[in-house]
């Protein structure tokens, strides 16, 4: 199992410094979200041009605000800047964001993703797109000098989205999904669908908060506050319920080095191919202890 790290909320200079340190520490990958801050692909274009080894990934870019051709052009540009080290993770986001903030319809999200992929997949493969659907059309090709085909992952939690990910992409990327749910739901559903579609082995990239600490109880209280929104968003709530977790703090990997190591190993045993650590800390000793454990696992 490969080990990556996740970062959000930094300036561009801080992101470059973080990526440089992650590469020096031996991490396999660096993942950046597209939320309400830096443009993830623009930021990774800069990182990819400056940091020579790390795989760079988005976890994830919402589909609705951008036409597939615009997203593909950004991804191919980041690919060109990084020598082909970009993996594009995309997702539906959430109804409260898409309708309440962006003003788009969230009707039939699986249909939306299926049509989006019909346009996006060929463009990421450096092939022309020729698709007309109910919600979007794409009849064009892109030419980005130096770009290589970009692997694609879909943030898939429910069965229909997992089946779609298996049929059309390289796999899935998950957040706030625990090892029991991965082992009993996510990985088997994805694998079965890939076997039926003949698409081969699937990649399962899974992220969770991680902290090595002597104050497990105190840091779990802190995690409950920091990550509380994920306990209310329906798609993540469904995964927490499958896991038997009362909230995000229950799936976070928090505690002694031995306990956190065992938690990461459970993710591997569940079928995760890439574990992404969201390094969660409140002080320097926790940050140092967490990073040291992760380095031991690389």
Predicted regions: what they are:
Residues 1-298:
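Active-site-adjacent structural elements that line small-molecule/cofactor binding pockets in enzymes
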